[in-house]
Every structure is written in structure tokens, then in C-alpha cells.
Amino acid sequence: MSIDKSYCGFIAIVGRPNVGKSTLLNKLLGQKISITSRKAQTTRHRIVGIHTEGAYQAIYVDTPGLHMEEKRAINRLMNKAASSSIGDVELVIFVVEGTRWTPDDEMVLNKLREGKAPVILAVNKVDNVQEKADLLPHLQFLASQMNFLDIVPISAETGLNVDTIAAIVRKHLPEATHHFPEDYITDRSQRFMASEIIREKLMRFLGAELPYSVTVEIERFVSNERGGYDINGLILVEREGQKKMVIGNKGAKIKTIGIEARKDMQEMFEAPVHLELWVKVKSGWADDERALRSLGYVDDL
């Protein structure tokens, strides 16, 4: 009697903030898991995305953007999380942006040179490169930086060449039993996913006005007799002015955020959702490691 082989392994997605790591993860999974927004540093937790296809299970670690400034407690912890997820993986996908190369990219590259895992270089947003003639010399420059397993020009947004990345990932998964059931997309709890969805809407509708020092706590997440969920979310900001900004004129902003978040939650949980949101000022939390621990920022460090 032959036993079918199965393959399973961990893959880290790394890169400086805002190069499209979360968008790439969502494309690889075929579902929106990691919080995506134009604002740098929006992925604060090591969300694990799981993609199972037949005998192959790829477990993705979506790291926070490694970046140079480490002044505040929250940023120190985020960089620590990003570095720790590089260590214990079969494969690393290093995402860079078009023909841009910055000191932050250099810093990530230096960390990767120290590691043992093979690295795929995903050159994202190639569809946005204005001067196509610049692309080839830039790819040659990148190729000279490190012995990459492969260099793949992609557009995470449109899906261009994402299947190529997925094929390379499959090829490098070691023979192993699957860690998760076939229908798992992420090992994070629904409560965590609810807070991520609210945070994404905050980023989307407040954009550059909103500092990173905003977080969401899910105070209540219960099933109701209608077969859905009652969810209460608490939005924590550092200053009274930020509270006014989140609430908006006559509550218009928080209403929009609530409506959009509820739609996404219903789609993700496949059930009706009753969502209530509050905004509260909790000053200085981004500099207080104890507060960060209580908010779950250091659960995986």
C-alpha cells in the first residue's frame, strides 16, 4: 500500500515597509488576510497565511517591514519580530519595489546575507516603472548583490508572475506532514482578524492623518442567537485630537469605518455581524512595552 507524500514548510516574506508584501501574500493565498494600506508599517503582527494545494502546504510568515528607525518601543518590537521570522524558514521571499533601492532595502539584504535560507527576489510594481529601459540594468545590479535563488519581476497588484513565485515555493517545500487542516487560511483567531480589519479601515479612511499609535482591542466577540457575531471594538489613540479625527464630523468617519469593517468581517466569517466601535484616549502607549504586551504586540517574540 503506497502512502502519498506530503510537503510542508515555512516561507518568510520580507522587505522594507510599503513594497507590497501584504498584497503579495494575499495574492498567493487567494484571499485577503494581511492588512494592506498605503501607510508604511501597517502589518504589526506576524500573521501566518496558510496555502494548501493537494500534497503541498506553504505556511507564510508576513513580517512587519524591517526599517531603520528603532526609537519607539513599538518599532523596536516590530523590527525584532521581522528579524526573528527570517531565522526558521525553508525559503525567504525578499520583496523590493521597481527600480527603487534604499538604505532600508540594504539593511534587509544584510540580514538575509547572514541567513542560511535560499532567497527569491521579487521585484514588485514593475508595471509602474515609467522608464522600462531602466529595469534591466537595475535587475542586473540586484543580481550582483547576492546569490539569489531566482529573481522574479512581479506585480502583486495585478497578479503578474505571482504563479511563478508560487511554483518556486512548492518546489522548495520539504517532505513533511501538514501542520494545519486543509481549510485553514490563517492560524490567527477570528478575534485577531476582526481587529486587523478595523485597523485596515482606519488606515484606509484616515490615511496619512493617522499616526501608527492607533490600535484596536476587541473587547467582546460572541456568537448570537441569529447565527452571527456581536463584536465590540475599542480604538485606542494617544491624543484627544486623534479621537476627534477618528470620530469625524457628527460621527460620520467612524460610521463609515464601521460599515466597511462589518462588510469585510461578514465576508470573512461567512455570518452576519453586529459591530459596535468606541474610541478612547490612552496616551503614550506606543512607548510603553507593558502596554504593548497587554495589546498582544509581543505574543510572538
Swiss-Prot record:
It is a peripheral membrane protein. PROSITE patterns: G_ERA, KH_TYPE_2. Induction: Expression increases as the growth rate increases. Encoded in the rnc-era-recO operon. It holds the Pfam family MMR_HSR1. Residues 15-22 are annotated as: G1. Residues 7-175 form the Era-type G domain. Residues 41-45 are annotated as: G2. The keyword Ribosomal protein does not apply. GO terms for molecular function: GTP binding; GTPase activity; guanosine tetraphosphate binding; ribosomal small subunit binding; RNA binding; rRNA binding; small ribosomal subunit rRNA binding. An essential GTPase that binds both GDP and GTP, with nucleotide exchange occurring on the order of seconds whereas hydrolysis occurs on the order of minutes. Plays a role in numerous processes, including cell cycle regulation, energy metabolism, as a chaperone for 16S rRNA processing and 30S ribosomal subunit biogenesis. One of at least 4 proteins (Era, RbfA, RimM and RsgA/YjeQ) that assist in the late assembly stage of the 30S ribosomal subunit. Its presence in the 30S subunit may prevent translation initiation. It is found in: Cytoplasm; Cell inner membrane. Residues 154-156 are annotated as: G5. The modification Phosphothreonine is found at T36. Disruption phenotype: Lethality. In the presence of 1% protein cells grow extremely slowly and are blocked at the predivisional two-cell stage of the cell cycle. In the absence of Era and Rnc there is an additional defect in chromosome partitioning. In depletion experiments cells grow normally for 2 hours when protein levels fall. After 4 hours 16S rRNA levels decrease with a concomitant rise in the 17S precursor rRNA molecule (extra sequences at both the 5' and 3' end compared to mature 16S rRNA) and a loss of 70S ribosome assembly. HAMAP family: GTPase_Era. The keyword Membrane applies. Changing N26S: Confers sensitivity to cold; overexpression does not suppress an rbfA disruption. GO terms for biological process: protein phosphorylation; ribosomal small subunit assembly; ribosomal small subunit biogenesis. Monomer. Binds both 16S rRNA and 30S ribosomal subunits; binding is inhibited by GDP and GTP. Bind preferentially to mature 30S ribosomal subunits over immature subunits in the presence of GMP-PNP. Binds to MazG; GDP-bound Era binds more tightly to MazG than GTP-bound Era. GTP binds at residues 15-22, 62-66, 124-127. This is GTPase Era. GTPase is competitively inhibited by GDP but not by ADP, ATP, CTP or UTP. Gene3D superfamilies: 3.30.300.20, P-loop containing nucleotide triphosphate hydrolases. Keywords: Cell inner membrane, Cell membrane, Cytoplasm, GTP-binding, Membrane, Nucleotide-binding, Phosphoprotein, Ribosome biogenesis, RNA-binding, rRNA-binding.
